[in-house]
């Protein structure tokens, strides 16, 4: 299935039904009085998080979602039937915002979490509500209220504890398949990974974390080059980033330091907050480096790259160093998870980047398929 992580939809709640102005007409009951019923309420539109869905593809092509109107009231004190609600099932991790106001409506972070997107209109009142001691046969009634109508932006950010960064063919997919049950496509050409992959890493009974692999970045990604810039948003919820570097590239003219520097630069251009996230350096493919050269090559890389943070030396293919890295990640997440989640919730509440400029008249909406 095609991975779609952004969509724009219109939700239209149902209008309330009109109240009825009716008089009781029955044999042997003179001056029966008013008996007009109320109109039914309009149906509302809800979103509900579903962990069994992992893409917004349904909403890329079905852009308008309408709830039913309430029925009008009738005589004999008959109230109109309420309109049926509409429920839209979305992946866990979906952020819903109003395109007109930029308001953050909901962040669906838990399975079965439900939120109202558009409220149905209230039903009108029948004339029986207007009867009084001075007005025994009222003709007044009220119309139903219109339902809410909204243009919404849906943005999926996968819920992962750890995110993988790196150039194409740095070994990210091999690493995630080595430490988890994820089965991403792996090949010896760039951009094998075309969509984010999630894997659950278990380090013991009831001890696990989720790791996200996104398509590799290249220089100029922040301006739209390559594929990775589309998916960097999926790293914004993570607690720590793993920057994988290929220490033994097939092409000897490729400089790992230059590639690593380019990744850091693109990260900073895209989002300063993402750049400030805790980041660990993971030097991969050590099995391809002769043992007598490893120490010198690692030292040379760290010296030229100017890195003073955590460093791990692994081989994703053979599994060397992967277990120690996973235990270190779990320990770090256990210590920092509570503070990270609280700060993330605070940042999301103040995030205004979901607000888009209105599309030009007659023009295509950004992100729509041709």
Curated annotation (Swiss-Prot):
Residues 128-147 are annotated as: Disordered. It is an enzyme of class 3 (hydrolase). GTP binds at residues 166-173, 191-195, 213-216, 284-287, 315-317. It holds the Pfam family GTP1_OBG. CDD domains: Obg. It is found in: Cytoplasm. Residues 160-334 form the OBG-type G domain. Keywords: Cytoplasm, GTP-binding, Hydrolase, Magnesium, Metal-binding, Nucleotide-binding. GO terms for biological process: ribosome biogenesis. Residues 1-159 form the Obg domain. Mg(2+) binds at residues 173, 193. Its EC number is 3.6.5.-. Disulfide bonds: none annotated. GO terms for molecular function: GTP binding; GTPase activity; magnesium ion binding. Its cofactor is Mg(2+). InterPro entries: G_OBG (IPR031167), GTP-bd (IPR006073), GTP-bd_Obg/CgtA (IPR014100), GTP1-OBG_CS (IPR006074), GTP1_OBG_dom (IPR006169), GTP1_OBG_dom_sf (IPR036726), OBG_GTPase (IPR045086), P-loop_NTPase (IPR027417). GO terms for cellular component: cytoplasm. Its main location: cytoplasm. Belongs to the TRAFAC class OBG-HflX-like GTPase superfamily. OBG GTPase family. An essential GTPase which binds GTP, GDP and possibly (p)ppGpp with moderate affinity, with high nucleotide exchange rates and a fairly low GTP hydrolysis rate. Plays a role in control of the cell cycle, stress response, ribosome biogenesis and in those bacteria that undergo differentiation, in morphogenesis control. Monomer. This is GTPase Obg. It comes from Burkholderia cenocepacia (strain HI2424).
């Amino acid at each position: 299935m095609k991975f779609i992580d952004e969509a724009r939809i219109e939700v239209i709640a149902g209008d309330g039904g009109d109240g009825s102005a009716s008089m009781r007409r029955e044999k042997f009951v003179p001056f029966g009085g008013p008996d007009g019923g109320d109109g039914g309420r309009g149906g509302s539109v809800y979103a509900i998080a579903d962990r069994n869905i992992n893409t917004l593809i349904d909403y890329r092509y079905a852009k308008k979602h309408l709830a039913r109107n309430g029925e009008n009231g009738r005589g004999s004190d008959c109230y109109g039937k309420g309109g049926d609600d509409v429920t839209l099932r979305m992946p866990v991790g979906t952020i819903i915002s109003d395109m007109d106001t930029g308001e953050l409506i909901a962040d669906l972070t838990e399975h079965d979490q439900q939120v109202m997107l558009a409220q149905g209109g209230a039903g009108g009142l029948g004339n029986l509500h207007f009867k009084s001691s001075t007005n025994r046969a009222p003709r007044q009634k009220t119309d139903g209220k219109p339902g809410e109508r909204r243009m919404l932006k849906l943005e999926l950010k996968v819920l992962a504890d750890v995110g993988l960064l790196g150039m194409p063919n740095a070994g990210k997919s091999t690493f995630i398949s080595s430490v988890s049950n994820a089965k991403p496509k792996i090949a010896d050409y760039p951009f094998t990974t075309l969509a984010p992959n999630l894997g659950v890493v278990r380090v013991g009974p009831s001890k696990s974390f989720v790791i996200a692999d996104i398509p590799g970045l290249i220089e100029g990604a922040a301006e739209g080059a390559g594929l990775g810039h589309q998916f960097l948003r999926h790293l914004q919820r993570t607690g720590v980033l793993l920057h994988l570097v290929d220490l033994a590239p097939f092409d000897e003219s490729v400089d790992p330091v230059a590639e690593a520097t380019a990744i850091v630069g693109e990260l900073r251009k895209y989002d300063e907050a993402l750049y400030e996230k805790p980041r660990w350096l993971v030097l991969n493919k050590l099995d391809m480096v002769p043992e007598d050269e490893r120490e010198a090559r690692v030292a040379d890389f760290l010296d030229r790259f100017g890195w003073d943070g955590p460093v791990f030396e692994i081989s994703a293919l053979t599994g060397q160093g992967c277990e120690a890295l996973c235990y270190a990640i779990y320990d770090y997440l256990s210590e920092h998870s509570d503070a990270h989640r609280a700060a993330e919730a605070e940042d999301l509440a103040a995030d205004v980047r979901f607000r888009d400029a209105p599309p030009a008249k007659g023009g295509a909406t950004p992100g729509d398929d041709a």
